[in-house]
Amino acid sequence: MLLKIDCVWEHNGNDSLLYAVDYIGAYTRGESLEIAKAKMPGEIASYLKWLGEDAPDSIEAVVVEEKESELDIKDADSDVLFESEKAPLTADEYEKLKSLALKSAMDFLALYKSIPDKSATAIAERKTFYGQVPRTADEMYEHTKNVNEYYFAEINVDADNNGNIYECRKRGYEALEAKPDFLQNTVIEGSYGEGWSLRKVLRHFIWHDRIHAKAMYRMASKVFGVAKIENPFCF
């Protein structure tokens, strides 16, 4: 069976980020669209395994939307708002997406906790648009956890980064749910004129988790061996 994956292509020149529209947070990167598309079957197979589902025999990425960007796409800087992220949410849809974002946080925490020495690294120093690339498990965890306040603030929700990654994210959703009209998914102009919506925030959490979980898992596997590291994301 062939599974066609609708994708949004964000690019700066040829540098490409490719996002799976219906598999929230699933993404690939590449020096060209062709490279990013070639990686998508593996990403979707991993994502489905993470969900406890079987992957089909064949997966094909199909670009349905394009965003040309001036950002450092090669470093996963992104400001795209999908057309599909502008529609209101049903309560069931929201609960499903929230559950995925909270599962992602719990799995990120499990991966982090499994690493024997959280100050070890096998990654060279490198600077990106947001500063030095996180190199140790501690640095990756803190960086990933500490977008919580920022992401929620972009849709006018007061949140913080206190506690672990799951706890602060869960509190953020509780603060969101105190707003009577949150399911309307209003599009808001946030920092630097970037468009945000609740749907985008839900995607961003899982996408950002996956970026740094992949980096953490690969680094830790190199240092300690795969047998010693949890792999809840099924990379």
Predicted regions located by residue number:
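A short mid-domain helix/strand-loop element embedded in enzyme catalytic domains
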Residues: 76-88, 101-125, 141-150
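Short, contiguous alpha-helical
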Residues: 6-33, 37-62, 122-166, 191-235
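A short secondary-structure junction motif
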Residues: 115-118, 147-155, 175, 179-183, ...
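Short, charged, surface-exposed hinge/linker loops at domain edges
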Residues: 45-94
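Short alpha-helical hairpin
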Residues: 14, 20, 73-84, 183-185
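Extreme N-terminal starter segment of soluble prokaryotic enzymes
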Residues: 1-5
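Acidic/histidine-rich alpha-helical segments that form the ligand environment
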Residues: 87-115, 160-189, 196-213
